[in-house]
């Protein structure tokens, strides 16, 4: 992996996410045969991470949701890996590989079922459950 040259931070990530959302909405309108839930599946991690972090900070921690923190799912995974491996760069690589591979595995069935609204709706719920379960399990270990 090349060393990172760009750092977006939370606000930059939110801005980039907004651009992606606009693109997805336009694509969804142009292709009505594809279930809107399919797009939810494709973008689930990106958007749910934002909403989950926003409400976690605002409601649970009672602080500004615009303040950065290290309690995102990928940061929890990174911290867990650092406990076993002190090499920060390798731990960062492993987090990227793990999250992208897991996400790809979860998305593949949706690609083949993108026109089946019922499947995509319930599959979105599975994503939600997996995210919450993973987050709670990792946050309890730290």
Give the role of each language-model region:
Residues 1-142:
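Alpha-helical transmembrane segments
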